[in-house]
């Protein structure tokens, strides 16, 4: 039985071979489904998630209301940067997880940069 590997999965593997997060400079990884956006800061050395924010999280659920997906992605980026600053994280390595740097992925990255994270 042949194993089907999508183009995004190939891109994701190629990116992950090149980048890795540490405690001082964790990896900001993004996942998007058709409805929701997920972003987290990962320390690959220890294998731990340091900060996690999603459109499904309780802290954002009330704020989002009836906004479109791109606006919700911006709020995820802002909330992630705020939580990272609270933990003393200033710099990150950006992992787009094989998704095109466009639309919601770009919105999360731009909002995180505006809120003070350095890529």
Curated annotation (Swiss-Prot):
One of its GO terms (molecular function) is 5S rRNA binding. GO terms for biological process: translation. The keyword Signal does not apply. This is one of the proteins that bind and probably mediate the attachment of the 5S RNA into the large ribosomal subunit, where it forms part of the central protuberance. GO terms for cellular component: cytosolic large ribosomal subunit. InterPro entries: Ribosomal_uL18_bac-type, Ribosomal_uL18_bac/euk. Belongs to the universal ribosomal protein uL18 family. It comes from the Bacteria. This is Large ribosomal subunit protein uL18. Part of the 50S ribosomal subunit; part of the 5S rRNA/L5/L18/L25 subcomplex. Contacts the 5S and 23S rRNAs. Transmembrane segments: none annotated. Keywords: Ribonucleoprotein, Ribosomal protein, RNA-binding, rRNA-binding. It comes from Anaeromyxobacter sp. (strain K).
